[in-house]
Structures are given as C-alpha cells and as structure tokens.
Amino acid sequence: MLIIETLPLLRQHIRRLRLEGKRIALVPTMGNLHDGHMKLVDEAQDRADVVVASIFVNPMQFDRPDDLARYPRTLQEDCEKLNKRKVDIIFTPSPDQIYPQGTEGQTYVEVPGLSTMLEGASRPGHFRGVSTIVSKLFNLVQPDIACFGEKDFQQLQLIRKMVADMGYDIEIVGVPIVRAKDGLALSSRNGYLTAEQRKIAPGLYKVMSELGEKLQAGERDLEEMIAIAGQELNEKGFRPDDIQIRDADTLFELTDASKRVVILMSAWLGQARLIDNKIIELS
C-alpha cells in the first residue's frame, strides 16, 4: 500500500498504472472511515485492478468554519483500515496541495440547479465545493470508475450530472446505504451523538420507513404526510431540518409520471445533523 501526499508523486504513479493498462477505481472520502466506506472499497475492488482511496477534509464544501474545525480527523486509524482492505494507494493531500492559493480565488465547478436546491438551499456553497474537489480528483487520478455512497443521494445525482455534462469517461457507481442493526445509517457524524442520543437516532429511519409505507399504500397528500412525519420526529426528540418527497431520477417535485420516489430527511439530534433517504418504487 502506498500513501501519497503530493500531486507530482500521485501523477507519477497514475502514469505508470495507465501504461500498464490497469483499470483504476477511485473512492473519495473525508476520512473518519466506517463500514459504509469499507463497502465502497469492496465495490471498487470488485470492479477494478487498482483502488485509490482519497482522504481529504475539503474546506471548500463546509459552509460553517466551526463545522470544518471539529470534523473528525483520524488519519492513522483510517490508513490502518484501508491497509487491512489491501487498498493500493491512499492519497492524503494537505489543503495547500489542493488549493495552493487558498479557496477564495479557486476556479470552481458548479452544477446548476442541483447545487442550490434541497440540501444546497440550506448550505450555500456546499455542493460547489463537492463538485470542485471531485472534479479535481477525477483529473488527478483519472479513474475508470468512482464509487459513492447512496446515503448522500443529492450529491450522487449531482456528480452523475457533472460527469455527463463535462464528458468524463468515468463510470459512477452508487453503493447502497450501510446501516447499523437498528437501522441508523452509518455516518462519520454519528460520532457527535451522546450515548442517549444514539438510542434515539434510529427513530429517523423508522419515521422515514413509515412515510414510505404510506406512499406505497397509495397516499398522496404529501403536505399532510410530511407534517405528520415532522411531528413524529419532534416527539422522538429530533429537531426536523427538512423532509422532502421527490422524483428519484430528477429530484424535482412529483408528477403523474413519477415511478421512483425518494424520501429525503434531515434532522438535528444534539450536535449531530443526521441525513437519510429511502427509494420507493410506485406501482
């Protein structure tokens, strides 16, 4: 396993792999790795000869400085986990390597519409930061495929559109959400939960699942269904942030033609902002 911190060294190894005809997979992460990330690695290994995992806490996608400052950084433990998974290359650049002139004057990539709706509306600049760093990593690693978790559903859709619009010859693989036994979606931010909050946290998935059952049963008063779900979250101890029911293919509001629906939920529990989603196939 190679640990690479600089762009020139990464380019050198990528050139060698390309000359050898290797199929390269990229797994972009911000570190603090858990079983959900390992699922991405497993998927990448099944589909490629070489796996490159990046660990970079991207300052450009944080809308609050305090959130960036407290984001968990566990590089040594992350490298140990990736080594056990036999990842070929770990790319761990510093912010100075990625943004040598800082983020303010950085050329950026922005996906219109998807960057500013839903999650993007409440986190200005977040998705611009995501699309910019992912585009940079694509240019540096030159992967044949890249694996992303479906937990960040809007992010996945945004990256797919960026790849299509920019003409990247990269297969984007969405990997299903990995959940704890009680249903809580695995997330690096779950570490912000206290022991008591961790007991409450699966309630988000429970409320979302009940909402999905109503949709499958034919209920269509979305405004009332969302209001009830928000009330249920409040009663469980959450502070609801956003609940949306959207077309899973476009992320726009439902139409009569919508066949795949995604429920998108976010809620605060103490200092942790939890997000989750569920795909519903309508008959």
UniProtKB/Swiss-Prot annotation:
Positions that bind (R)-pantoate: Q61, Q155
GO molecular function: ATP binding; pantoate-beta-alanine ligase activity
Annotated compartments: Cytoplasm
Keyword Membrane among record annotations: no
Active site residues according to the UniProt entry: H37 (proton donor)
Biological process terms in GO annotation: pantothenate biosynthetic process
Keyword ATP-binding carried by entry: yes
Binding-site positions, beta-alanine: Q61
Disulfide bonds: none
The enzyme's E.C. designation: 6.3.2.1
Pathway annotation: Cofactor biosynthesis; (R)-pantothenate biosynthesis; (R)-pantothenate from (R)-pantoate and beta-alanine: step 1/1
Domain of life: Bacteria
Pfam families, A to Z: Pantoate_ligase
Residue sites binding ATP per the record: 30-37, 149-152, 178, 186-189
SUPFAM superfamilies for this protein: Nucleotidylyl transferase (SSF52374)
Physiological role: Catalyzes the condensation of pantoate with beta-alanine in an ATP-dependent reaction via a pantoyl-adenylate intermediate.
Family: Belongs to the pantothenate synthetase family.
PANTHER family named among the record's database cross-references: CYTIDYLATE KINASE/PANTOATE-BETA-ALANINE LIGASE, PANTOATE--BETA-ALANINE LIGASE
Binding partners and assembly: Homodimer.
Note: The reaction proceeds by a bi uni uni bi ping pong mechanism.
NCBIfam families for this protein: panC (TIGR00018)
Protein name: Pantothenate synthetase
